[in-house]
C-alpha cells in the first residue's frame, strides 16, 4: 500500500479570475468597444438649481429622482403631442401641438407658466438662428 500524502494546512481558495478587460488594440482588426453612454438631464438640472438656489446642493438620489421626473414629463408631452398630430392628420409635431399637449397635461397656473416660458424659449431660439 502506498504511503498517504502529507496533509497541508487549508489555504485560501484561489481567487476567481475576473473576465479579461476589453482589448484596446487587437491584432485581428476588431474595433475597440466603448462604454455605452447614459444620457441624463443632470447637468441641466444642476444649472437650474444653481440659478435659483446658489448655496444649495443635490444628492445623487435626488438627482436620479429629478431625472426620472423630467423623462416622465417629456414622455407624457411627446405622447400627447403625437396623438394631437394624428388627430389632425399631420405627420409632424409642431410647437402648436407641444403647446396644446402642455395645456392638457399640466394643471392650471403651471400650464400657463410653462407655455409662456416655452414661447419665450422658441422666440429666443428663432431670433438667434436667423
Curated annotation (Swiss-Prot):
<comment type="subunit">
    <text>The nucleosome is a histone octamer containing two molecules each of H2A, H2B, H3 and H4 assembled in one H3-H4 heterotetramer and two H2A-H2B heterodimers. The octamer wraps approximately 147 bp of DNA.</text>
</comment>
<dbReference type="GO" id="GO:0005634">
    <property type="term" value="C:nucleus"/>
</dbReference>
<dbReference type="InterPro" id="IPR055333">
    <property type="entry name" value="HISTONE_H2B_site"/>
</dbReference>
<keyword id="KW-0158">Chromosome</keyword>
<feature type="modified residue" description="N6-acetyllysine; alternate">
    <location>
        <position position="8"/>
    </location>
</feature>
<feature type="modified residue" description="Phosphoserine">
    <location>
        <position position="11"/>
    </location>
</feature>
<feature type="cross-link" description="Glycyl lysine isopeptide (Lys-Gly) (interchain with G-Cter in SUMO); alternate">
    <location>
        <position position="7"/>
    </location>
</feature>
<keyword id="KW-1017">Isopeptide bond</keyword>
<protein>
    <recommendedName>
        <fullName>Histone H2B.1</fullName>
    </recommendedName>
</protein>
<feature type="modified residue" description="N6-acetyllysine">
    <location>
        <position position="12"/>
    </location>
</feature>
<dbReference type="GO" id="GO:0003677">
    <property type="term" value="F:DNA binding"/>
</dbReference>
<keyword id="KW-0238">DNA-binding</keyword>
<dbReference type="InterPro" id="IPR007125">
    <property type="entry name" value="Histone_H2A/H2B/H3"/>
</dbReference>
<keyword id="KW-0544">Nucleosome core</keyword>
<feature type="compositionally biased region" description="Basic and acidic residues">
    <location>
        <begin position="1"/>
        <end position="19"/>
    </location>
</feature>
<feature type="cross-link" description="Glycyl lysine isopeptide (Lys-Gly) (interchain with G-Cter in SUMO); alternate">
    <location>
        <position position="8"/>
    </location>
</feature>
<comment type="function">
    <text>Core component of nucleosome. Nucleosomes wrap and compact DNA into chromatin, limiting DNA accessibility to the cellular machineries which require DNA as a template. Histones thereby play a central role in transcription regulation, DNA repair, DNA replication and chromosomal stability. DNA accessibility is regulated via a complex set of post-translational modifications of histones, also called histone code, and nucleosome remodeling.</text>
</comment>
<comment type="similarity">
    <text>Belongs to the histone H2B family.</text>
</comment>
<feature type="modified residue" description="N6-acetyllysine; alternate">
    <location>
        <position position="17"/>
    </location>
</feature>
<dbReference type="Pfam" id="PF00125">
    <property type="entry name" value="Histone"/>
</dbReference>
<keyword id="KW-0597">Phosphoprotein</keyword>
<feature type="region of interest" description="Disordered">
    <location>
        <begin position="1"/>
        <end position="38"/>
    </location>
</feature>
<dbReference type="GO" id="GO:0046982">
    <property type="term" value="F:protein heterodimerization activity"/>
</dbReference>
<keyword id="KW-0832">Ubl conjugation</keyword>
<feature type="cross-link" description="Glycyl lysine isopeptide (Lys-Gly) (interchain with G-Cter in SUMO)">
    <location>
        <position position="18"/>
    </location>
</feature>
<feature type="cross-link" description="Glycyl lysine isopeptide (Lys-Gly) (interchain with G-Cter in ubiquitin)">
    <location>
        <position position="124"/>
    </location>
</feature>
<dbReference type="GO" id="GO:0030527">
    <property type="term" value="F:structural constituent of chromatin"/>
</dbReference>
<dbReference type="InterPro" id="IPR000558">
    <property type="entry name" value="Histone_H2B"/>
</dbReference>
<keyword id="KW-0539">Nucleus</keyword>
<feature type="modified residue" description="N6-acetyllysine; alternate">
    <location>
        <position position="7"/>
    </location>
</feature>
<feature type="cross-link" description="Glycyl lysine isopeptide (Lys-Gly) (interchain with G-Cter in SUMO); alternate">
    <location>
        <position position="17"/>
    </location>
</feature>
<keyword id="KW-0007">Acetylation</keyword>
<dbReference type="InterPro" id="IPR009072">
    <property type="entry name" value="Histone-fold"/>
</dbReference>
<dbReference type="GO" id="GO:0000786">
    <property type="term" value="C:nucleosome"/>
</dbReference>
Amino acid at each position: 500500500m502506498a504511503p498517504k500524502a502529507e496533509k497541508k494546512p487549508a489555504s485560501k481558495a484561489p481567487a476567481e479570475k475576473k473576465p479579461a478587460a476589453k482589448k484596446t488594440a487587437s491584432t485581428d482588426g476588431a474595433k475597440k468597444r466603448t462604454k455605452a453612454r447614459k444620457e441624463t438631464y443632470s447637468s441641466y438640472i444642476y444649472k437650474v438649481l444653481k440659478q435659483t438656489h446658489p448655496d444649495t446642493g443635490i444628492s445623487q438620489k435626488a438627482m436620479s429622482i429629478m431625472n426620472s421626473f423630467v423623462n416622465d414629463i417629456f414622455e407624457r408631452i411627446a405622447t400627447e403631442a403625437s396623438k394631437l398630430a394624428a388627430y389632425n392628420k399631420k405627420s409632424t409635431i409642431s410647437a402648436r401641438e407641444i403647446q396644446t399637449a402642455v395645456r392638457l397635461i399640466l394643471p392650471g397656473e403651471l400650464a400657463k407658466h410653462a407655455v409662456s416660458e416655452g414661447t419665450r424659449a422658441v422666440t429666443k431660439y428663432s431670433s438667434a438662428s436667423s
